[in-house]
Amino acid sequence: MGKKPLNENQVKSLRKLVSGKPLHELLLNLSVDLMLRGSDLLNLKVSDVISENGKVKSEVMVKQKKTKKSTLRIPLSDHSIKTIQKHLMDKSRDDFIFKGQKSYTGKPISVIQYTRIVKQWMEMLGVDPIDYSSHSMRKTKPTVIYEKTKNIDAVRRLLGHSSVTATSSYIGVTDNSALDLARTYSF
């Protein structure tokens, strides 16, 4: 299954813990909402989330670099919209959203730095960071959606996966969880 996803309570706790830290607020909310690989997330620009007329977009269109598949259309939550309004409205549309402390370079933080931040968040939560990385953030929302709905095809589409098999493996649908589901619907 790889790195663990966060659960809803961990995300809610982190929102409080990172409040007031622009990079962390943006990274937390957008990484959970957009469900993107680190490289795709970090390459987002302000123009991806704010329209030409200066309004925050309700959906983000992203073409995943790894798969080069069709463009994904992903909705933004109220948390992300408010965070964008709070931290990005005065930025140039050409700016990367996730600029690091060396912002004079104009480049976004690296995936390595993103992983360090995620591990730092886990430490803030009192959780062993060994099982978490930037990829944990990509897995968080799809795992919660699957746990609540059991709709693996919807999750597959949100992640841009080509097969349900890949998605099942990715979010850790095990034989035991499938059997538990079958037991739930005995009649």
Residue locations for each model-derived region?
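Conserved catalytic core of the tyrosine transesterase superfamily
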Residues: M1-F187
